Amino acid sequence: MKNINPTQTSAWQALQKHYDEMKDVTIAELFANDSDRFAKFSATFDDLMLVDFSKNRITEETLAKLQDLAKETDLAGAIKSMFSGEKINRTEDRAVLHVALRNRSNTPIIVDGKDVMPEVNAVLEKMKTFSQAIISGQWKGYTGKAITDVVNIGIGGSDLGPFMVTEALRPYKNHLNMHFVSNVDGTHIAEVLKKVNPETTLFLVASKTFTTQETMTNAHSARDWFLKTAGDEKHVAKHFAALSTNVKAVGEFGIDTANMFEFWDWVGGRYSLWSAIGLSIILSVGFDNFVELLSGAHAMDKHFSTTPTEKNLPILLALIGIWYNNFFGAETEAILPYDQYMHRFAAYLQQGNMESNGKYVDRNGNAVDYQTGPIIWGEPGTNGQHAFYQLIHQGTKMVPCDFIAPAITHNPLSDHHQKLLSNFFAQTEALAFGKSREVVEQEYRDQGKDPAQLEHVVPFKVFEGNRPTNSILLREITPFSLGALIALYEHKIFTQGVILNIFTFDQWGVELGKQLANRILPELGDDKAISSHDSSTNGLINRYKAWRA
């Protein structure tokens, strides 16, 4: 990968000039001037996903200039580097190969002179055998009963991805009850343990190193709870499995290392749902559906790695995002899935994007003087319409939005889905075109009211419009289409990181807080007043000690 400061490219300079020409152009004008705008600014993936980016403040010239930026920053070379197993995570000297985990074509992918695919396939086969034993009831707990509940204990990528996918694919789930515990707050594990029976519960401990503070604290509490009933430590092996690489620590915990599922240092946490970390997904929806999830992602991987830039969906979405973030000064992006099963999708992408591209140092080690990753947030529609859409429609901040919806619902109840989709279509239209003062006044006339007498209200009912959106319409949310959708966003994030000259696959920003927490923890063990920190931290700790006494 080349380290190129994007602001020093001729494409960036051209985009700055172009922004001056575009900043006052409205989406309404762009549609009025081009009856084919939708056809030109939308694309379909595999007849499963329609991506409409026509309601953006862009022209063909905008996209051409953004594509020039991708060329000048050698995006094509970076894509080749990632897919070929080059160690593009240079701060940790690691390859970045979540694409290998879903490489259904099974073509060799070489890291350090070795094809990783045989090991990937071996772990998949092991997961298949294990999951079939659990799901079929062949696997018995210590009292001879089949497993009914699975508790996944992990945090970050070991929780957000599997939790999001198992929720999104609930229509495909089997009889097993899935639970996810992440927070070190004892309330999280305590509330889950109230719902399960030690005789019929399987715990998955998801920690690559088997040292993650939150995960191991919860795992030990789960083990203690289990042994209060089971008694004999040898029973732990029937009720705990590990998603880890630390054979010694897993064995010491009491887990049979035959039930330890490995993954590799070239799998980043927030890209790990495709790996052994996805075992909870398999236990929820079955191995065949997990393979479909992998296959959908692999199809998007092929699209991303082989499709020209001008038709490449992850690249186009990434470029449009850079346009708003760096030229219009937009600080956030809203992810708005119109599907209740997708209620964890925004939280998943929040980590995927913000932990990847929330960096202020470029790949040369210098502080950047441009914007990097945006703030990602969102909630399912239509809930968000009754919460924060007010600001998106009439606030002073530009919030580019991605609207996501399936054409076919898994729950065709009455006319619920038509009502949901009518809102999905209406919101992007309203955000793009708004409502003028003239229309507001005419509405009053149509109601037999005199606008002059309502002058004090009229300004508040005007919508400026010109708020940009992308619409992603899926035929249906299936394991395959969900896999493709997740991979679409993964590659969008990667593309932005390449162009912005930052390292997308490390996360040093999570370390400092952990270090300080480890230093503070022993200080909380007694009632002595603390004076070793700044006055604020000392004051907070000392008040905590006083109140807990």
From Swiss-Prot:
Keywords: Cytoplasm, Gluconeogenesis, Glycolysis, Isomerase
One GO CC term, this protein: cytosol
Localization per record: Cytoplasm
Pathway field: Carbohydrate biosynthesis; gluconeogenesis; Carbohydrate degradation; glycolysis; D-glyceraldehyde 3-phosphate and glycerone phosphate from D-glucose: step 2/4
Major localization listed first in the record, in broad terms: cytoplasm
CDD domains xrefs: SIS_PGI_1, SIS_PGI_2
Enzyme's top EC category: isomerase
Annotated GO biological process: gluconeogenesis; glucose 6-phosphate metabolic process; glycolytic process
Transmembrane feature ranges: none
UniProt keyword DNA-binding present: no
Active site: 355 (proton donor), 386, 514
GO terms, molecular function: carbohydrate derivative binding; glucose-6-phosphate isomerase activity; monosaccharide binding
Catalytic reactions on record: alpha-D-glucose 6-phosphate = beta-D-fructose 6-phosphate
SUPFAM superfamilies, alphabetized: SIS domain
InterPro entries the UniProt entry points to: G6P_Isomerase (IPR001672), G6P_Isomerase_C (IPR023096), Phosphoglucose_isomerase_CS (IPR018189), SIS_dom_sf (IPR046348), SIS_PGI_1 (IPR035476), SIS_PGI_2 (IPR035482)
Record flagged with keyword Isomerase: yes
PANTHER family: GLUCOSE-6-PHOSPHATE ISOMERASE
Annotated function: Catalyzes the reversible isomerization of glucose-6-phosphate to fructose-6-phosphate.
Assigned protein family: Belongs to the GPI family.
NCBIfam families in UniProt: PRK00179.1 (NF001211)
Identification of the protein by name: Glucose-6-phosphate isomerase
Name of the gene: pgi
